[in-house]
C-alpha cells in the first residue's frame, strides 16, 4: 500500500519502489499500469492545499520481467534524480512566497489608515525589509543548487540547504503577507491565502525539513548519522 499519491487516479503508469529483500540495498523499482489485476485505488484524500491524494493498493500484483525498471541496488541510482525534483519543489515554494510578498507590497501602497498609506508606517517597512532579505537570500541558494546541478555537479547538501531556506521563506512570507493585508489576504478571493496553504505542504513534500536538516548536519561534520535503530 502507498498512502499519499498526488492526483494518483489521473495517471496511467506508476513507478513503484519495491523490496527484493531486506535492507535498502535490495530496493528497486517496477512499472505498474492502471487496470492491472490486484491494483486498486482507495478513497481520495483532500489536503489543506486543495490537492487530491489517493491511496494505492497492491494485492498480489504480477509484474512481468519487461516491466522491471531497476533491480536490487537500483534505489540509490534512482534517488540521485531526487535532487532535481527537490529543486523544482524549492522553486515553486519560493515563487509562492514572492507572489504573496508582491501582493502585500501593492496592498501597502494603496491601503490607507490614519490618513496615510500603510507603507509609510515604519513598523510595516521593517516587515517588508525582513521579507525581502529572506526571499532574496533563499533565491541565491536556489540558484547555486540549480546551476551546479545543470552543470552536472549536483550536490545533495546544496539542494537540501536551498529547499529548507526556500520552504521557510515561502511560508513565512505568505504568512506575514496575510497579517499585513488582514481580511483581504485571508479571503479566498485573494491567492495569498492559497500561497500560505501550498507553501505549508512543501515543507513536508519532497523531503521534510527535519530530514534535510539531518542531511545538512552530515555535511557540516563530514559524517553519516544513521537515524534508525543501532545494529546489534
What would you call each of these model-derived segments?
Residues 32-36, 67, 98:
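Basic, amphipathic alpha-helical recognition segments used for DNA target recognition
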Residues 34-62:
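Flexible, small-/acidic-enriched active-site or ligand-binding loops
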Residues 28-29, 40-43, 64-72, 230:
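Short, charged, solvent-exposed linker or helix-capping segments at domain edges/interfaces
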Residues 12, 52, 160:
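Exposed loop/turn and edge beta-strand positions of beta-sandwich/beta-sheet ligand-binding modules
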Residues 1-10, 20, 44, 61, ...:
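Active-site beta-strand/loop segments that form the cofactor-binding cradle
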Residues 1-40:
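A short core secondary-structure module
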Residues 2, 47-48, 86, 163:
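Active-site PLP-lysine loop of aminotransferase-like
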Residues 57-60, 72, 80-232:
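Alpha-helical interface subdomain recognition
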